[in-house]
């Protein structure tokens, strides 16, 4: 049964208001729904319905985390909002069992999340949050929002009161500065990977296509284009700034960087050390999974079986210095090889920018709270171990952040595998209880040196022998 969206009550003071309904706030809403002592909650999302990266739901593309990294299981395996229960309700549990798939298709994960989003009460799609204010007299936040019609136009204004807020506004496509001139309208299509499927047919009409970016999205798009092009007339370039088309670190001990243990360790490090670590760990979250790399090589090799090499060029270690349009029908890229210190030009008919995402800035949304918001030396919001913004003593309510704290919590901040744990951490802190008991240890790796236990009796020191 689909839950009918309730009209927000303008007089009620909620316990929690969520802003943004992506996987992370959807996880929070699902676990909040299962609390033994119910919370009054409302979650707002500007989009008309839940959709998870619709432009990247490429046929056959899978998640890079196991299905256990759903919205709830790693905090509450008995929750009715688990992926396995979704499979049961769809009468697909036995087929899934026999499929023996630990990593599910992205389209299936999207369908699962949409199923949850249509069942949970208190989710308000088509609502744009405009401002957040602190009301000291009533010790609560005022959340101003606009209800949008089916065309995205303003329909009515509203205000919701709440004791606490969870920001889950997600990320937005990132386009590096040298590539921004390409985003102007022109006959040669230049699109971000986030919109790939929406423009795929138009891209395939181009004689030559260039994919820029060495991460998983770039690899999947290159593979999809390669499979769609005729042998010998592929007309593809794949450029990467990284020194290699490198695999993602997926060893079992390497994956322990995506545990609560490592998150706590990272948060306790000095700010300067954290800032040094994050870019060094790019292969933990920006590499390509082994299966995709193998599939690309297999497809390229298959195209050599009858002699000749495919018309596909894969070049790592390349940065785009400048870019522009040629006669409005083609694109010219000025390239530099970082190891050779050589430069060249590449003219192409279409470009896919698989250049990643950045956290959405919070400053506009938090404009009225700016005097209370404490920042680090780089001007970023400080976030404590419970994922709360440091707002100073004048604001007694909490604002929790989800996927806006990589600078304080490390590479696991955007990882789906930590979604349920972070949601449970937030709810335990918000309620002051432990409705979701969390494991004390989650990794075999001991990150850092632990403080030695103080012995009950001072040991006798034995002098070191001189050589």
Where on the chain are the PLM-derived regions?
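Glycine-rich phosphate-binding loop and adjoining beta1-alpha1-beta2 segment
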Residues: 52-71, 257, 288, 292
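A conserved beta-strand/loop capping segment in the N-terminal third of enzymes
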Residues: 74-106
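Flavin (primarily FAD) cofactor-binding/catalytic cores of flavoenzymes
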Residues: 1-48, 96-216, 220-467
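Tryptophan-centered motif/residue detector
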Residues: 52, 83-86, 115
């Amino acid at each position: 049964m689909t839950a009918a969206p309730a009209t927000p009550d303008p007089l009620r003071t909620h316990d929690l208001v969520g802003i943004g309904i992506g996987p992370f706030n959807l996880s929070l809403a699902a676990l909040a729904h299962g609390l033994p002592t119910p919370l009054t909650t409302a979650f707002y999302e500007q989009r008309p319905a839940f959709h998870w990266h619709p432009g990247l739901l490429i046929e056959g593309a899978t998640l890079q985390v196991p299905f256990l990294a759903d919205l709830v299981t790693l905090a509450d395996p008995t929750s009715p909002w688990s992926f396995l229960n979704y499979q049961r309700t769809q009468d697909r549990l036995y087929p899934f069992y026999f499929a023996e798939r630990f990593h599910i298709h992205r389209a299936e994960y999207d369908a699962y999340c949409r199923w949850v989003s249509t069942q949970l009460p208190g989710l308000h799609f088509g609502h744009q949050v405009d401002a957040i204010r602190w009301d000291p007299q009533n010790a609560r936040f005022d959340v101003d929002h606009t209800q949008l019609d089916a065309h995205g136009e303003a329909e009515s204004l509203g205000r919701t009161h709440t004791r606490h807020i969870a920001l889950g506004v997600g990320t937005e496509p990132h386009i590096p500065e040298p590539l921004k001139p390409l985003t102007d309208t022109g006959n040669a299509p230049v699109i971000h990977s986030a919109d790939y499927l929406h423009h795929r047919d138009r891209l395939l009409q181009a004689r030559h296509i260039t994919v820029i970016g060495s991460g998983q999205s770039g690899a999947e798009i290159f593979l999809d284009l390669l499979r769609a092009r005729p042998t010998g007339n592929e007309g593809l370039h794949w450029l990467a700034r990284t020194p290699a088309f490198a695999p993602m670190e997926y060893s079992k001990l390497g994956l322990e960087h995506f545990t609560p243990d490592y998150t706590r360790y990272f948060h306790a490090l000095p700010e300067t050390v954290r800032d040094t670590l994050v870019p060094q760990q790019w292969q933990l979250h920006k590499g390509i999974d082994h299966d995709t790399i193998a599939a690309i090589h297999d497809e390229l090799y298959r195209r050599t079986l009858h002699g000749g090499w495919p018309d596909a060029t894969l070049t790592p270690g390349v940065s785009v210095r400048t870019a522009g349009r040629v006669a409005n029908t083609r694109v010219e890229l000025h390239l530099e090889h970082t190891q050779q210190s050589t430069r060249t030009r590449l003219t192409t008919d279409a470009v896919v920018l698989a250049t990643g995402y950045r956290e959405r800035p919070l400053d506009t949304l938090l404009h009225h709270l700016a005097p209370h918001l404490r920042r680090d030396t780089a001007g970023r919001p400080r976030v404590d171990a419970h994922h709360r913004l440091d707002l100073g003593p004048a604001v007694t309510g909490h604002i929790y952040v989800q996927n806006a704290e990589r600078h304080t919590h490390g590479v696991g901040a955007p990882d789906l595998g930590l979604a349920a744990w972070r949601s449970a951490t937030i709810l335990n802190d918000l309620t002051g209880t432990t409705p979701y008991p969390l494991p004390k240890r989650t990794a075999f790796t001991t990150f850092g040196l632990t403080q030695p236990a103080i012995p009950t009796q001072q040991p006798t020191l034995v002098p070191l022998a001189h050589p």
